[in-house]
UniProtKB/Swiss-Prot annotation:
Species this chain originates from: Hahella chejuensis (strain KCTC 2396)
InterPro entries named in the record: SfsA, SfsA_C, SfsA_N
CDD domains per the UniProt record, alphabetical: SfsA-like_bacterial (cd22359)
Protein name listed in UniProt: Sugar fermentation stimulation protein homolog
Gene Ontology molecular function, alphabetical: DNA binding
Length: 241
């Protein structure tokens, strides 16, 4: 995925009100940009980090610039724009990168599914040999000692999605949860049970019920992101803290 990044990054001054961030440009000027991420962004919003952002070119927008990537003080890249993971996974399915989700001629975004009338990020269909597959995508940027965790804050929405995926399996369809790992420092993924205990419990329940849980890591450079590497998903380890 190509991203039209403004050539010169800024330095993060602060993130606030969830959807806003102030950055300092190389000439010393300050700019307020849109932060498309409702999570805690732990480790990805440290003052002084390099912020790579895009420009919509739309003067009618109150905040025409959007925060896309961050380079942490440790030199690691992360994609903080939560609109990107769905696109990345869709591209990776089309390119054959996610082997587990091949064999479907049709792919549709934002399809209603489940008992609670949620929307799947993708529905794969049209196979004469495989049941339709409902795919939920989650962005993973919380990195602690090389391990990625999801969620980075208590997520009732994430809990609901796991319940919906289990209902899909009960009804004879396929359900897949794809952790889109958008932090260069992550080498393995686990549920953040220390942050959201119910999510961790539901993930274990979902795996037992037959929901397929996958993790794929992106290769990030300023201007381009693409999924390239499958990672292991392991249980939460309390001894890691």
């Amino acid at each position: 995925m190509k991203i039209d990044i403004v050539p010169t990054p800024g330095r993060l001054l602060k993130r606030y009100k969830r959807f806003l961030a102030d950055i300092q440009l190389p000439d010393g000027a300050e700019l307020t940009i849109h932060c498309p991420n409702t999570g805690a962004m732990t480790g990805c919003a440290e003052p002084g980090s390099l912020v790579y952002y895009s420009d919509s070119g739309n003067p009618a927008r109150k905040y025409r610039h959007t925060w896309e990537l961050v380079e942490t003080p440790a030199g690691e890249f992360a994609c903080v724009n939560t609109a990107r993971p769905n696109q990345l996974v869709g591209e990776a399915v089309d390119a054959g990168v996610i082997k587990e989700l091949q064999g479907y001629p049709l792919k549709k975004a934002e399809v209603k599914f489940g008992d609670q009338n949620s929307r799947a990020d993708w529905m794969l269909s049209g196979s004469s040999e495989l049941p339709d597959c409902y795919v939920e995508v989650k962005n993973v940027t919380l990195c602690l000692h090389g391990r990625g965790y999801f969620p980075d804050a208590v997520s009732t929405r994430g809990q609901k999605h796991l319940e919906e995926l289990m209902s899909v399996v009960r009804n004879g369809k396929r359900a897949a949860l794809v952790f889109c790992v958008n932090h260069s420092g992550i080498s393995v993924v686990s549920p953040a049970t220390h942050i959201d205990a119910r999510y961790g419990a539901l993930l274990s329940e979902a795996i037992e019920a037959g929901v397929e849980v996958l993790a794929y890591k992106s290769e990030i450079t300023p201007g381009e992101i693409r999924l390239t590497q499958k990672l292991e998903v392991t249980p939460f380890d309390s001894e890691a803290f």
